[in-house]
Design a protein with these regions (language model features):
Chain A
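Short Pro/Gly-enriched beta-strand edge/turn motifs at strand-loop
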Residues: 79-81, 177-192, 277-284, 325-328, ...
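Short acidic, glycine/serine/threonine-rich loops at helix termini
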Residues: 81-85, 121-124, 195, 217, ...
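Glycine-rich loop/linker segments at domain edges
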Residues: 12, 18-21, 85-86, 157-202, ...
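Extended active-site and interfacial segments that coordinate phosphate-rich ligands
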Residues: 17-21, 123-132, 136, 220-222, ...
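Helix-loop-helix junctions that connect adjacent transmembrane helices in secondary transporters/permeases
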Residues: 147-233, 402-492, 700-714, 719-721
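Thiamine diphosphate
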Residues: 246, 250-272, 276-278, 506-514
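C-terminal catalytic domains of large/alpha subunits in multi-subunit enzymes
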Residues: 73-74, 234-239, 269-275, 304, ...
């Protein structure tokens, strides 16, 4: 079958297969699930950040005619479920027992006939609190007089969680000591929130007769969740089925197991009916996994000519009231140690101290690639601070320091082995597309007239695709993912995956991977995902890992099928397997191309009666579990133009050019979409997104009126392009793209804003750069938002 | 109380509390789950439906108020198996990823094109500025609407043109 | 109007996470008279439901919980109009934001309305939200209150057997408080037309659709090159209904740019902004001055017929 430009068989731009249901409003999201007799749950949450629970009176709520049950922490204690393990080997309260430790913490669970009555019943629960002083500032969490938040933990006498270091401190100190220039800068990556348009929720249906629990859930990792429920709830794992139906955006928000899910499960067991729990937006913003909140002290050392020699950083990581971040066990600060960036440096060191505060738990979310957002922000801002100090153009400074292609695979000073890269080419391409020289000339002219125009450059290298099982596990589950390919007798196929799309287009791109390997058209390949009963085990989708891990598994499974097809074809054509050659879609006899068999014909024969060699089984199915040998390292060069109103300090993003390199490109249309989404995240974080708190720990970012997300009017028409530097260790050379733009755009925009404010001598301004905060910087009073 | 609402040219009567919001009426009472909800403060716009041809946020409208008006939801865009050009446009130009904001975006696009068949990029961005998308970055949504503007459905034949 | 919504503080102080209003009884008004009758019958626990964008969000957050809602959606034709009559523009209280935005009459004679509507909420909200609903909610950051104050609008309030007209100073009692009493409703807004009147509105917001960080409306009437009347009103910065000192600085003088700047300084000095997530008090005061100056400049230019 011929491949065409509109309908590629394999890689190329093709429209998405999943669109058909979404454009008709026939997506099946968790809140769309309706089961007979289904009840609705709602959570009563703490109004205060830190308090002892004196009493909980649920009697009035139980009197409500539509209420079926009210569950409290005390009830869960009886089931040993009041606390659950987190993905970081800490514990988290499902429903509070002794204390509440953040505003919005779960205190009671009401189950009622419908969502309206469930919420009415919340007002009938009377809780008496004894307020305690709250720890809100992470910098003060380790003060001697700071109240101890986790007094539930044995041997916990302060708010310290962990210390973690990477790199060589002695070597780094030495480099800094002899450097011509050292620039130091405090910077904050403020607390933000992934805020997908669909909030989190679950429908739990415990079948008392079969003993099987079916859980529809907004989860990016259904299999991992299943295992967690087996461990936590003591339910046998084969009696748990987790279904991620369509998910309305994940962005890392839907990786953790939330108390609401556990309550829904308990609720179904207790009432004998299906129980739906869907959080509303304030709950999502106030209690589910936030992102970032890294207080950083960075330093960069260089020669006078602008050769960067060392980078160092100390971080206070605010993890909230429970350490519930998701990242591989050995890396409590995720992959932050990729802060070494895209540069050839002599030494680097980082120390990260994790602390508890009276705020919602989390930290790893919002497309951070396990803290790569924080790392890239740090290094790209430091490079610009250095450029400012030395008076060197920031693009020029980067060109003097970027790693060269012949240096790859490159082992950076904190141990990462970057797989491949041709950085200069990508940066120059971005500069050419945006017309960098021309922009600098325009800027000079505008500055002369008092206008504030800024040009920001950012270059990033990510570390994604976790990961090798030797190094990377979450809760002891190795981060390997599988793929199962079945090719039916009529030559159509089904691919079952362990990863979980939330909009990334897996139903299309993974079919394209199989199509590329086997020549079966993508429309003949059904991609199945999200149901733990029918898909292979894996750790799910986040950290841009689907293409690097499951994409590899898929390609390898397809190749196994192709190898099997060769044997079947050799039986069909009565030649030796070595006499066969492959062209996409068929094996044919070398030197006699007319004589061949299409993959469809081979499929039928494989299931048929043809005699196969000894040891060769029938059918054309194949499966793989992929253990990546390394992470992959997508990279990119971003350049942004902003204009700042000198009187109101309002920032407008005028242009944004993004040149991404994600290795082999499966579907350019989908890649572009992923990049556009991430660039918008950058506008959000750089200009307006902030989960703020007052000094009592009241959350000030608990609605979309306060937590501002960009609209179409804040975003320019994105300009994107690409380079291709395949990953040498990946079966199809692909690196992943999902989080690149979220990683690379915030520092690029901040760099542009600081550049615009050069006439005011501004060295740094923390995000979000709201008009008021930019104005403060112009007055010489820049300060972190919290 | 009894509430009768006309949705996609069909009347539905249900007995509901006065406080029932139109979005829940559509989703929970009628099973029309194409209309979504995503916030508590009328900001996100995933609940947008058309009322008398104009976009409204169904989370901020009582079902009772909707009585007496003509409501169109995403389920009403496709007619007799023929997709609306906006639906086609969103598929052609990758105007959706997770699909959650999409019904509202398409309906607003439909209303815009009905008033202004050839909108500029700026006018499209303005029209969707009350609705948030976390996935697409909006540029492909703008392209999708432009595609629909450039590929309007063939006008329905007049009664004289239809042959017996 | 009796049941008052408590201030929606930025501290988002809510007891319980909810998404739906508390229960209430519902009635549909068939006319203004019928609405007033119902208000009287049902008493202080009844609220009028117009566009719904001020009241329903409050009710969903359980910050307001009236026992009765009187739906006046059906009054949209009776009370939805913008017309010129007797040297005035008369706007029905149920006129939608979108109608105000698209009004040719307002764009040419009172463009302060058009300027403001461009930056009020978002296009979807503007399809339903009404001027009456906005004015009666009287949120201190609400733009149309400042617009009406700047142009010296008269509010027509009708009761069962009586109709009275008040100016903005009397109408705006304080945050979330207006002069509309029990068993009364706002029915019309009237603004005197003057060919020598120019008006404009300026606003800074963190993002489209957000409440103002600061906003300023100005209306200037000139005669023989001299200011005969000036209306200056700020939103979101704790200002008085209008900035009287600033207005007085202009009346009787030629509107030079220095004079406008001076008036802007008076306006900025007289307001009482609060620091919050939208901005520091200092920033808001600074921008109050900037925007007042900009609004005055454009109002004067329009009065002189020099700007669309």
């Amino acid at each position: 079958m011929a491949t065409t430009e509109e309908r590629p068989i394999g890689f190329g731009r093709m429209k998405r297969k999943e669109d058909a249901r979404f454009i008709r409003g026939q997506g099946n999201y968790v809140d769309d699930v309706q089961l007979p007799g289904m009840l609705h749950g709602a959570i009563l949450r703490s109004p205060v950040a830190h308090a002892r629970i004196v009493s909980i009176d649920t009697s009035a709520a139980l009197q409500h005619p539509k209420v079926h049950a009210v569950i409290t922490g005390k009830d869960l204690e009886g089931l040993n479920l009041a606390w659950m393990p987190t993905l970081s080997y800490d514990t988290q309260a499902v429903l509070a027992t002794d204390k509440v430790r953040f505003q919005g913490q779960e205190v009671a669970f009401v189950i009622a006939d419908d969502r309206y009555s469930a919420r009415d019943a919340l007002e009938l629960i009377d809780v008496e609190y004894d307020t305690l002083p709250a720890v809100v500032n992470a910098r003060k969490a380790l003060d001697a007089d700071a109240p101890v938040i986790r007094d539930d933990k044995e041997n916990q006498t302060d708010n310290h969680i962990f210390d973690w270091e990477s790199g060589d401190r002695a070597a780094t100190d030495e480099v800094f000591a002899r450097a011509d220039v050292v620039v130091e800068q405090d910077m904050l990556y403020p607390r933000s929130h992934p805020a997908p348009m669909e909030t989190c929720g679950a429908v739990a249906d415990m079948d008392k007769v079969s003993g099987k629990l079916t859980l529809w859930c907004t989860t990016q990792a259904p299999h991992a969740h299943r295992t967690v429920y087996a461990l936590v709830a003591g339910l046998p794992e084969h009696k748990i089925r987790v279904i991620s139906p369509d998910i309305g955006g994940g962005f890392g928000n839907k990786v953790p197991v939330y108390p609401g899910y556990v309550c829904a499960v308990v609720g179904s067991i207790v009432t004998g009916k299906p129980v739906k729990w869907m959080e509303d937006r304030s709950e999502n913003l106030m209690s589910t996994g936030f992102a970032r909140d890294y207080v950083m002290k960075g330093g960069i050392a260089a020669t006078r000519e602008g050769k960067i020699t060392g980078i160092r950083v100390d971080v206070i990581a605010d993890h909230g009231a429970f350490n519930a971040t998701a990242q591989p066990t050995k890396y409590p600060a995720g992959f932050f140690h990729v802060f070494t960036g895209s540069y050839d440096i002599e030494a680097a060191h980082c120390k990260v101290t994790g602390v508890y505060t009276n705020k919602a738990p989390g930290g790893v979310a919002y497309a951070c690639s396990f803290r790569v957002t924080e790392a890239v922000y740090l290094v790209e801002r430091m490079v610009d601070c250095l450029a400012d100090e030395l008076g060197i153009d920031p693009a020029e400074l980067r060109l003097r320091n970027l790693l060269r292609p012949d240096q790859f695979p490159y082992e950076c000073k904190t141990g990462w082995v970057y797989d491949s890269g041709d950085y200069e080419r990508t940066l120059r391409k971005a500069m050419e597309i945006i017309g960098y020289e021309q922009l600098r000339r325009e800027q000079a002219e505008l500055r002369g007239r008092g206008a504030l125009m800024g040009i920001g450059v950012g270059f990033f290298t990510e570390a994604v695709g976790a990961g090798p099982r030797k190094h990377m596990d979450i809760l002891g589950l190795g981060m390997n993912d599988g793929a199962e390919l079945r090719i039916h007798p009529t030559g159509k196929a089904q691919l079952s995956l362990s990863v979980q799309t939330q909009g990334q287009g897996h139903e299309t791109t993974f079919a394209q991977i199989v199509a590329e390997e086997l020549g079966i058209p993508p429309e003949d390949i059904d991609v199945v995902h999200g149901d733990t009963d029918t898909t292979p085990y894996g750790l799910g989708t986040y950290g841009s890992r689907s293409t690097p891990v499951s994409g590899a598994a898929t390609a390898l499974a397809a190749r196994k099928a192709r190898d099997k097809a060769r044997i079947v074809a050799s039986a069909m054509l009565e030649v030796a397997p070595d006499d066969l050659e492959w062209e996409k879609g068929r094996w044919f006899v070398k030197g006699d191309p007319e004589k061949g068999a299409t993959i469809q014909e081979i499929a039928m024969a494989a299931h048929g009666v043809i005699e196969l060699p000894a040891g060769v089984e029938g059918g054309l199915d194949a499966e793989t579990v992929y253990d990546p040998p390394n992470l992959t390292f997508p990279f990119g060069a971003y350049i942004c133009v902003v204009d700042v109103d000198p009187d109101t300090a309002k920032v407008k993003v005028r242009r944004f050019v993004a040149v991404d390199d994600c290795g082999t490109r499966i579907n350019p249309m989908i890649i572009e979409g992923q990049v556009h989404g991430g660039l918008t995240d950058g506008v959000g974080m750089a200009l307006m997104e902030l989960i703020a708190f007052d000094e009592d720990g009241n959350c000030l970012g608990g609605s979309l009126m306060d937590y501002l997300i960009p609209t179409a009017l804040e975003c320019p028409d994105w300009e994107t392009d690409h380079t291709v530097t395949p990953s040498p260790h990946h079966p199809i050379g692909a690196k992943g793209i999902g989080e690149s733009a979220t990683v690379g755009s915030p520092p690029t925009i901040v760099n542009a804003i600081v550049d615009a404010l050069k006439p005011y001598g501004v060295r740094h301004i923390d995000m979000p750069c709201t008009p008021s905060r930019v104005w403060d910087a112009m007055q010489g009073k820049a300060a972190p938002p919290q | 109380m009894q509430v009768t609402v006309s949705i996609n040219d069909q009347e539905y009567t249900r007995d509901v509390e006065p406080r029932m919001l139109l979005v829940h009426f559509l989703r929970d009472e009628l099973g029309l789950t194409g209309t979504h909800w995503g916030c508590d403060t009328s900001n996100c716009g995933t609940c947008v439906v058309l009322m008398d041809g104009e976009p409204v946020k169904s989370c901020t409208l009582l079902a009772a108020t909707a009585a007496g008006h003509e409501i169109k939801t995403v389920e009403g865009l496709e007619v007799d198996g023929v997709l609306d050009p906006v639906q086609q446009g969103f598929t052609e130009m990758h105007g959706l990823q997770c699909g959650f904001c999409t019904p509202g975006m398409m309906l607003t696009a439909r209303a815009l094109l009905d008033r202004n068949p050839n909108p500029t990029e700026e006018e499209i961005r303005e029209a969707i500025s009350g609705q948030i998308c976390r996935c697409t970055g909006y540029a492909t949504i703008v392209r999708s609407v432009r595609w629909a503007a450039e590929h309007p459905a063939a006008p329905a034949p007049s009664s004289e043109e239809v042959t017996a | 109007m009796s049941a008052r919504a408590r201030a929606l503080t930025l501290g988002f102080e809510r007891k319980d996470p909810v998404q739906v209003p508390a229960p209430f009884e519902y009635a549909r008004a068939t006319s203004v008279d019928n609405a007033l009758e119902l208000l009287q019958q049902l008493g202080p626990e009844a609220r009028l439901l117009a566009g719904g964008y001020s009241l329903l969000p409050m009710m969903k957050l359980r910050l307001a919980a009236p026992e009765y809602l009187i739906d006046i959606d059906g009054l949209a034709s009776e009370l939805g109009y913008i017309r010129e009559s007797d040297g005035e523009v008369r706007i029905g209280a149920m006129t939608r934001h979108r109608e105000l935005l698209e009004s040719e009459l307002l764009a040419t004679r009172l463009p302060i309305f058009t300027d403001a509507e461009r930056v009020i909420a978002d296009p979807v909200v503007r399809n339903r939200g009404t001027i009456g609903g906005a004015l009666c909610q009287a949120d201190p950051a609400e733009d149309l209150s400042a617009v009406c104050a700047a142009v010296g609008a008269q509010m027509v309030i009708r009761g069962r057997n009586v109709e009275r007209t008040v100016g903005m100073r009397e109408f705006q009692r304080g945050p979330y408080e207006t002069a509309v009493g029990e068993a009364e409703m706002l029915v019309e807004i009237r603004v005197a037309l003057d060919p020598n009147l120019g008006s404009a509105y300026e606003k800074v917001e963190r993002r489209v659709g957000d409440w103002a960080v600061t906003a300023a409306g100005a209306a200037v009437t000139l005669s023989g090159g001299i200011v005969t009347r000036a209306g200056i009103a700020l939103a979101a910065v704790g200002a008085e209904v209008t900035s009287v000192e600033a207005e007085n600085a202009l009346v009787g003088k030629a509107p030079t740019d220095e004079l406008l700047a001076e008036a802007a300084r008076f306006a900025a000095a007289a307001c009482s902004p609060a620091s919050d997530q939208r901005g520091s008090a200092e920033y808001k005061r600074h921008v109050a001055g900037v925007l007042t100056h900009r609004a005055l400049r454009r109002a004067v230019a329009r009065a002189l017929g020099r700007e669309a």
